[in-house]
């Protein structure tokens, strides 16, 4: 109450910011007449003038009014579009590192040109982030004309581009690309073996288009680069035979009394959390069955450390059978399991569930089981975008998530007023008892719109629902077009024409995002079609264009008179923001429009969160069949349910981020080390530090710290140094000859002997010949252990919640154990690198160079590299790295290269891990060749 009172007096934070920005808008408007008088060359010369002023110490904020005036004038000349004052406000919010909420149709793409131009003047690069390749291409070409006119370079960063083209795109003043591609380039840059192979420069400033989609909807799914891992096909098939023999328990047991179970069973299913849990009896039965199938040794428990993987596979098979259903969560097409996206209903071709779940579903369906992948590198969008020096975003719907943007990213949301107020009529929801009644009412509404000529956009949340509407409209004899997973290529064209008279378009949630629905149809597309028709001469084209313009004007006014675009939705999404996005398709730039949601008590959101309350209202009112309830209290109940779901989803994302922050800190350390190794001209100091650490640890196994001579095992230490490290030193003799020797002296003696042994090897061929080999051994070891570490963190994360039962804080336990694992990773790298460099037998610089090249090739040529990333529709896309596959094929690694490498590793013990980093024993890997 007090807050509202103060807001009325002083205005909200948003009002105060806009008031401040409006003063700058007045200064920009005052400059307009002066800039209009400039010639094209004079306007273009402003860019160099601004750069010179920055070099002399002026800030971007000092230049803002003039820079914005330059862009506005350039846009008038090149694009025939003048920035509105509200677009200048949006540009200032973006420059200040905030999120600008601008309604659909308010010109976000043009608004972005203002801060993009201003920040590009610094010469540090600006990244414009879009949700898909189509928009990146479209915006770069469309707005590129303006930037080029003003003397700035523009690059487009697309998937599968050759490395040289990517470097050129990132070297431009302004780079357009998708969020996924920027993130993957960052990960790939931290996997290269040559400094010149990196493509990105510093992460200076990014503007994220559709920021809610990228930083919230896609934030639960990390970017993952993976390669082929070990094959467990037989295990999946065997466990698939065990699972049908376990029975489901009906009812839930009260933890205090044990009552509540109606039918005893081996496992319970929790649909809300999407998990399956074995009961106590179920554990015993599962262990017995696994023993019968020879999967579990006699007397062993599923909880033994050695059987963690088996438990993991059993859980995946139970979830696959009881929580993932064919034609609802996935479809089987051409012998493959294809996931159906729960939000949009689109088929996610190429995407695979992780943690062995996809393979378990493949085993259940009896299709070919494809091998699991090993994660090579991974990052979440939260942690990638927080690497930028300055971040900003724009969207039509950010206000409902403003708290999350502030909490997670430190981004403030500024609501930019529309240029013209919307005339859209958002009608109250209509709630019916059954799904059948709901669809009948929606079809009747569509029929009425069609008969009077009003265009309709029908929004659905899944392919399944869009197909139901499609079938009902066909049955009703109403012509329409469907926009879902099967129509990707035509999305923008269909959406552009969805505003024509008598047009009925069915669209899943995010289809065709980024394209405006213009009442009467998109005239630009119509004119473009005429201009591209080579069969017409210029005079005919001009006449046809004039005719099309007249016809469009009539249609436009006619559709406006009917009430504009009608939005009909057949269910509420669990996020208010996505409902608002659907509504926002109508009533653009002051056009009329209307929207209505048709719901039933059977809808998932109603059933789980709001159904009982609304059903009670219906029963009290004694509603007859076919009648709907339409009241503010119902709409508010539904919005309250949505708020609960949004809060829950926010908590999930926040918790994920807190866990990911642990691996993010470790990722920064590893990537920093990698870059230092890549850029260093000489690695001898780093290698010496690793060697000292390794031999100190070795000595401490035989000569404990602060111990007396009687506790020392010098004979054992001598033997180990000779057998494992090739260092022959009469340690016992030296100690006996000396007057007084401490444990620290022993360490110094052994480290000196190791240094002398290594220096003698280096002196043989020269340090400069050795550096590249050292670099490759270091990078290979870091990469191999980092990948194993990522898998360990993943497994740790999955079981960490169980620590809560031991009265421990799972998050703290995760941090502690992850830190221990990271310490083990660094120790493993230290020991492995030292062992490889100490035991390698070197005869010539050429031989060492060949071995370094072979290590580099092995590091770069991982087979079947795939990229897993969320898309703007909520689906997760997985694609193969075609460039990588071509490079491997071209390299054609043969025995000659491997033979040279094997010779270089000739002093490695037969049962030791192979120095190439494959994880196999030396005798089963390169030892075969020596």
Curated annotation (Swiss-Prot):
Subcellular localization, as worded in the UniProt entry: Cell inner membrane; Cytoplasm
Membrane topology of this protein: Peripheral membrane protein
Keywords on record: ATP-binding, Cell inner membrane, Cell membrane, Cytoplasm, Membrane, Metal-binding, Nucleotide-binding, Protein transport, Translocase, Translocation, Transport, Zinc
Pfam families for the chain: P-loop_SecA (PF21090), SEC-C (PF02810), SecA_DEAD (PF07517), SecA_PP_bind (PF01043), SecA_SW (PF07516)
Organism, scientific name: Variovorax paradoxus (strain S110)
Gene3D superfamilies the record matches: Helical scaffold and wing domains of SecA (1.10.3060.10), P-loop containing nucleotide triphosphate hydrolases (3.40.50.300), SecA, preprotein cross-linking domain (3.90.1440.10)
Necessary cofactors: Zn(2+)
Disulfide bond keyword on record: no
SUPFAM superfamilies attached to this UniProt entry: Helical scaffold and wing domains of SecA (SSF81886), P-loop containing nucleoside triphosphate hydrolases (SSF52540), Pre-protein crosslinking domain of SecA (SSF81767)
Binding positions (ATP): 87, 105-109, 516
Reaction catalysed by this enzyme: ATP + H2O + cellular proteinSide 1 = ADP + phosphate + cellular proteinSide 2
Gene that encodes the chain: secA
GO molecular function: ATP binding; metal ion binding; protein-exporting ATPase activity
Binding sites annotated in the UniProt record for Zn(2+): 914, 916, 925-926
Gene Ontology CC annotations of this record: cell envelope Sec protein transport complex; cytosol; plasma membrane
Details of cofactor binding: May bind 1 zinc ion per subunit.
Cross-referenced InterPro entries: Helicase_ATP-bd, Helicase_C-like, P-loop_NTPase, SEC_C_motif, SecA, SecA_CS, SecA_DEAD, SecA_motor_DEAD
Descriptive protein name: Protein translocase subunit SecA
Enzyme kind, highest EC tier: translocase
PANTHER family: CHLOROPLAST PROTEIN-TRANSPORTING ATPASE, SECA INNER MEMBRANE COMPONENT OF SEC PROTEIN SECRETION SYSTEM
Subunit structure: Monomer and homodimer. Part of the essential Sec protein translocation apparatus which comprises SecA, SecYEG and auxiliary proteins SecDF-YajC and YidC.
Lineage of the organism: Bacteria, Pseudomonadati, Pseudomonadota, Betaproteobacteria, Burkholderiales
